[in-house]
Amino acid sequence: MNYKEKYRQWLDFADPDTKAELESLTDEKEIEDRFYKDLAFGTGGLRGIMGAGSNRMNRYTVGKATLGLANYLKSTGKADLKVAIAYDSRNNSADFAKTAAGIFANCGLHVYLYDRLVPVPVLSFTTRYLHCDAGVMITASHNPKEYNGYKVYDAKGCQLCTADAAAALDYINAVDDYNAIPFCNDHANIHPVGDRELDAFIAAVEQQSLYTQPSDLKIVYTPLHGTGNVPVRRVLRNMHVSVVKSQELPDGNFSTVRSPNPEEKDALTLAIAQAKAEEADLVLGTDPDCDRVGIAVRDGDDYVLFTGNQTGALLVQFVLTMKKAQMNEKSTLVKTIVTSDLGANIGRSFGLQIEETLTGFKYIGDKINTYEQTGDKEFVIGYEESYGYLVGTHARDKDAVVSAMLICQMAAWYKNQGKTLVDALNAVYEEYLSLIHISEPTRRRGIS
């Protein structure tokens, strides 16, 4: 079927709002772009520009993926299947989550749907905590406001790896009739979740706490209009934290930034300006789904932005210093192949085993699952150069909540010694830089 035939097909079955959007299109190239292919379901799930069409994120493409995923889960033959669903602050995220919940419920699955926006690591944790068979997170990470996405997690709270994603894709591709999608607005199989699960997540994060001595460390935090505001402030409640008010509340248009990506200096401009006014020591910024965190550190009258490699290496040293007595021959650090060797060499100096994975945090999560199954190794910390870190096994995805807590505790620990994180990084370079050939490889921009 060519794009024109697909366009006419959609005009026949679409709801009034979708049909009106399609009928308003006058640019043939735009029509072609919306229908020349189906939105691809890859190892990261769905991700695309929102709008009407088979190559866009909308209730129909979400519905197709959900029906296919439901059929895939039912093919296992397991009874009483359960799915956890959460969503971020993006436009249409809550609607897409409700669409998915209704379809899963109509297919006979029990759905545990968050009653509020929450971070990605909360969904990963909840999938495990409620013993679900799968999880779905509606998010497009730090992409521009026009985008949204649909991430799929397995029963362990890990994003689907290659084999499972391929198996699910077969069932999704088999859905070729949008009229067959069992949309449903309400169903007895949909169970709201919220306070209890979020409290359990916070408790799990706080079990990773490493330094709680009083400190006069001053922090400026921005959730960049995303999901981090509540959970990050909860784990930092005993520290001196001020929030960038204009970026505090959820806003799917990300009105104050060009891009809500904490890798980019522009995203932290307002936070750094506030930090200068308040003479804060540390700036934290989490992306909209709060799985990545960027930092800027006061250095004299200016603020220095750290890369993911730098922050990760400092976290490795801090965590291992604080947990040195708990380390054993099984203790393992996991990093991706594009992440610098600085943290790995710090890990080796503490006697840790080092494992490398392909790019994408799901591979780090998969390693944690393997360690639990075999008992051969014990996960201590995992990270990637694109600002994603995990300490603890409460989740199987990168977690900016636990990372923010530990970064602030690390900064407080150093400040109580009369040092900044810049001082700490310089000391790390002096001690470990001679052990590696390349300290800061060029960062490969991408989505994980």
What is the role of each PLM region?
Residues 129-157, 165-173, 261-285, 316-319, ...:
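Phosphate/diphosphate-binding loops
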Residues 115, 174-196, 299-383, 390:
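Proline/glycine-rich low-complexity loops and linkers
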Residues 436-447:
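Single conserved hydrophobic/aromatic residue that forms the stacking wall/gate
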Residues 14, 30-35, 39, 148-269, ...:
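Gly/Ser/Thr-enriched, mixed-charge loops and adjacent short helices
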Residues 5-100, 194-216:
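An N-terminal, well-structured beta->alpha segment
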Residues 37-55, 223-231, 383-387, 393-402:
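Conserved phosphate/anionic-ligand binding catalytic regions in large, soluble enzymes, centered on
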